[in-house]
């Protein structure tokens, strides 16, 4: 049973800034990382700079021995109208004919790198959706391992076809795994808005939480997850991914299996025999059926 913190407890947690960024925030407390889009005035739409910062923060989480779970969310509310958002996708103000134009003038589509980083990360990533999850932002919540949504403010909407864009990868195919082919096609082809409860009933949200308790609940889910074996959690994540990820998924899973094998006495015998220039002897090792 997952224990839940009260919202007042969450406010007093001593989050520590890992690194100061311009368009995201990146904090950590007790092994839980909190990464948030920080452009609430535009519903947390992302630019190439946002995505570069997000990717760097996720890589830091991937490599850290001190971080066990990642919470991905959006800062808010908006200073313009008080609205909340997780992420509303790519900022159309910097969209060009060949991608999204960064400050260096180069057109890029680097949000797909972030999707892959979340998908292949060796840790659980939880989307914490306080408001709008739209377009590319909707795809990001889909690719996360779990999603918690604000009962009062979360809205799920896929606007790709409205702006002549499309996510033909995880954002659509993996969504269909979650909600079924017919509902996924409805979400994309009609572009309707869905409440947190509707998203939960479809199967793309794990829990609907009162807004004031959303982040506290996310933190408690993260802490509960961290009580589990990190190796088992990692292998379970990659195993669950494997059926959809083809040879890439197989490579990720097999790589981690090889790492586990390196810790066995059998692997040590193979290494030592090579270094000592002697005949290897695997005869003493069991052959489990």
Regions found by a protein language model. Give the residues of each.
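Conserved CoA-thioester-binding segment of acyl-CoA-metabolizing enzymes
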Residues: 2-75
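Well-ordered beta-strand positions
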Residues: 146, 186, 190-192, 198, ...
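Glycine- (often His-adjacent) and acidic-residue-rich active-site loop
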Residues: 42, 74-117, 162-164
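C-terminal long alpha-helix characteristic of the crotonase
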Residues: 40, 81, 149-154, 205-252, ...
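CoA-thioester-processing core
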Residues: 114-120, 128, 134-188, 202, ...
């Amino acid at each position: 049973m997952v224990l839940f913190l009260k919202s007042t407890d969450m406010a007093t947690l001593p989050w520590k800034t890992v690194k100061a960024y311009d368009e995201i925030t990146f904090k950590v407390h007790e092994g839980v990382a909190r990464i948030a889009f920080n452009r609430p005035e535009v519903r947390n739409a992302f630019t190439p700079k946002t995505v570069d910062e997000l990717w760097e923060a996720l890589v830091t989480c991937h490599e850290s021995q001190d971080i066990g779970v990642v919470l991905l969310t959006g800062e808010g509310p908006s200073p313009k109208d008080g609205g909340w958002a997780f992420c509303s996708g790519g900022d159309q103000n910097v969209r060009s004919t060949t991608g999204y134009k960064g400050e260096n003038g180069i057109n890029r589509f680097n949000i797909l790198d972030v999707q892959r980083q979340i998908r292949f990360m060796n840790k659980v990533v939880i989307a914490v959706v306080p408001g709008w999850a739209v377009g590319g932002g909707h795809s990001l919540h889909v690719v996360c391992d779990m999603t918690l949504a604000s009962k009062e403010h979360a809205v799920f909407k896929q606007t790709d076809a409205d702006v002549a864009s499309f996510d033909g990868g995880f954002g659509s195919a993996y969504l269909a795994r979650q909600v079924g082919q017919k509902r996924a096609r409805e979400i994309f082809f009609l572009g309707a808005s869905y409440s947190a409860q509707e998203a939960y009933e479809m199967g793309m949200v794990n829990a609907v939480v009162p807004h004031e308790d959303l982040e506290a609940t996310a933190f408690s889910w993260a802490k509960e997850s961290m009580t589990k074996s990190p190796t088992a959690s990692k292998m379970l994540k990659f195993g669950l991914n494997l059926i959809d990820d083809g040879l890439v998924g197989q490579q990720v899973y097999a790589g981690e299996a090889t790492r586990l094998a390196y810790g066995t006495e059998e692997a040590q015998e193979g290494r030592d025999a090579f270094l000592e220039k002697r005949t290897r002897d695997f005869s003493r090792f069991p052959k489990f059926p």
